[in-house]
């Protein structure tokens, strides 16, 4: 009986942890269920400076970062390894 209780506790903890890491849609900021979005027409005066920079191709957060991930991980590992040796 004790093993079954422990099993249920562990399964409950795993369920809670997996819910934290699961991807789900956040229904705010104009999004509605079904993937529908509220359509608003913005005036040109409401366009922020960041959007203007993105239209010019200067926004860093829209650039693909996939190629540099492995390089960054390897460099961090090398730096940590060299710091441990000192």
Curated annotation (Swiss-Prot):
Its main location: secreted. Pfam families: GnRH. One of its GO terms (molecular function) is gonadotropin hormone-releasing hormone activity. The modification Pyrrolidone carboxylic acid is found at residue 25. Olfactory bulbs, hypothalamus and telencephalon, midbrain and posterior brain areas. The modification Glycine amide is found at residue 34. It is found in: Secreted. GO terms for cellular component: extracellular space. Residues 1-24 form the signal peptide. InterPro entries: GnRH, Gonadoliberin. Keywords: Amidation, Cleavage on pair of basic residues, Hormone, Pyrrolidone carboxylic acid, Secreted, Signal. Belongs to the GnRH family. Stimulates the secretion of gonadotropins. This is Progonadoliberin IIA. It comes from Carassius auratus. The lineage of its organism: Eukaryota, Metazoa, Chordata, Craniata, Vertebrata. The gene is gnrh2a.
């Amino acid at each position: 009986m004790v093993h079954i209780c422990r099993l249920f506790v562990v399964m409950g903890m795993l369920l809670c942890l997996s819910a934290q890491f699961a991807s789900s849609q956040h229904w705010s900021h104009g999004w509605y269920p079904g993937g529908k979005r509220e359509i608003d027409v913005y005036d040109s005066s409401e366009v922020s400076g960041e959007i203007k920079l993105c239209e010019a191709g200067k926004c860093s957060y829209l650039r693909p970062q996939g190629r540099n991930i492995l390089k960054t991980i390897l460099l961090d590992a090398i730096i940590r390894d060299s710091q441990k040796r000192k």
